[in-house]
Amino acid sequence: MKKVLVFLWAAVILAAGAFAAVRYFVPEKAEPAKSGGSDLLVSITDQKLMTAYYENQNKLYEEKMTDYPAMALDRKKRILYYTNTDNSNVKHLIRLDLQSGKKTTLYSGDEYVDGLSLSADGSKLFMRYNLAEERNFHLASFDLKQKAFHVIYPSLKNKDKSVSYYQYNKANNRFVILHYSLKEDYQKTDEANSKGVPPEPTNMNISLADVKGQEKVRTIAKFINDTAISPDGKTIVFTESADDQKAIYAMDAETKKYKAIISDQRAFSLVDSAQPQFSKDGKKLYFLAEAKDAKLLEDETGSEARVRTIYSYDMDTKKVSKAWEKTNGIINTFTVIDE
């Protein structure tokens, strides 16, 4: 089931136990981006398995890692939303008021959620959503007032289609979704195992959707791990990883033609899911990679991973620059949070 938990790609995904250690950092106001770049929300886990949430260079909060972290930030109200798991394997969706330090548990249960995004009006959280007894993931919303989930795609009746990644576009209140067939995926995996060869890539579908419907853009038979769309909706990007070669592709949303724009270079190597994301003006593309001289870290369980860096790629000049890095931990995920 190589795509069922597609967000769990980092070596830092470990059984960390109870979250006894907690540190809260009082931010007076939103932290501005440095050097004219985009504002970033970053989740990073250190060698002691403490997961910290940063708004640019400002540490908002940290606690012991209990599961792969998901997060979203309401910059106007100064609210951090994040997830954790307790010793009984119960999942929690937490609301943290960054001004008062007050925590509110919005949801507790068996459902698994990740990939949090805050709606443009701040009334909902979007996420990948998985029922405990099911194998496929859905794109869903959580109403912050009613405290209720609503499945967007695919329907709960559909047990085959699974959302492996999505991105929410605040500019037009739409989504770009990466999804595939579980049946096809298992079939290709079983065939490869029986022949003793690597599996052929499952057909990955890239679709655009809103809360009411979905339209397919293109089906691509590649090992695709993520996707994103430009603010104007004209360019879709995705990361492909195959045979130790990784690249970020840009696809024209109208013609459906695509080409590689970023690949491994002397200075860095892309990670399996580079999490590409556009700046608000669409002029820069941010992504995750490992610098060639990246420090190797070992956590308290003995697991090793290299430090990751967030880079920016100028869509006009093609220049790549470092945007965010800390050498004492591994970046789990990040979000461009330009207002």
Regions found by a protein language model. Give the residues of each.
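Hydrophobic membrane-insertion alpha-helices, especially the h-region
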Residues: 7-20
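An edge-strand/N-cap motif at the start of beta-rich repeat modules
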Residues: 22, 26-61
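Blade-terminus and WD-like Trp-Asp/Gly-His loop motifs, strongest in beta-propeller folds
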Residues: 29-36, 71-79, 116-124, 166-175, ...
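Residue position within the beta-strands of beta-propeller blades
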Residues: 40-44, 80-83, 124-128, 175-179, ...
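Multi-bladed beta-propeller domains
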Residues: 52-69, 95-112, 142-163, 209-225, ...
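Short, conserved, GDST-rich strand-edge loop motifs in beta-rich repeat architectures
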Residues: 85, 130-131, 178-200, 288-306
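A detector of repeated loop/turn-to-beta-strand junctions in beta-rich toroidal repeat architectures
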Residues: 90-92, 136-138, 201-205, 245-247, ...
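Solenoidal tandem-repeat scaffolds enriched in leucines and small polar residues
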Residues: 150-152, 156-222
